[in-house]
A protein has these predicted regions:
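Amphipathic alpha-helical assembly/interaction segments
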Residues: 1-132
């Protein structure tokens, strides 16, 4: 994938994760103060950790048959997946406690689901590419 100027296009999973993070930062900014340093900061941290782990995974160069590189990339991908699941749970708690609105929760879970699906597809693709 190439863009103008010879720069590579970003992975769609990273783009979706950035959209998720941006939405979360916007939504949690308006959360009640009593949740700001507990639930909302943890939700924000999970969103940022997802992006961080995706970038780390993408920086691991894979070649056919290089199982050690695959393991390293897979570790970052799994960390990102775990962060997605934790984000989903924390968002549920935030909705139940009134830190975010039900519609905001729906948006977060929808965006999180997209990231998880794309991440799962990336993991499978890497596995096929390296092992075949």
């Amino acid at each position: 994938m190439e863009r103008k100027g010879g720069r590579q296009a970003e992975l769609s999973v990273i783009t979706k994760a950035k959209d998720l993070c941006s939405y979360i930062l916007t939504v949690t900014e308006k959360s009640p103060k009593r949740f700001r340093f507990t639930l909302t900061s943890r939700i924000q941290n999970h969103a940022l950790n997802i992006i961080e782990n995706l970038y780390r995974a993408n920086e691991v160069f894979l070649t056919k048959g290089d199982l050690s590189a695959l393991d390293k990339r897979l570790e970052y991908q799994r960390q990102a997946m775990t962060e997605c699941k934790l984000l989903s749970y924390m968002s549920l708690v935030a909705r139940e406690q009134g830190a975010i609105l039900p519609k905001q929760y729906e948006q977060i879970t929808s965006k999180d689901y997209d990231v998880q699906n794309l991440l799962g597809a990336w993991i499978k693709s890497d596995d096929r590419r390296v092992k075949n």
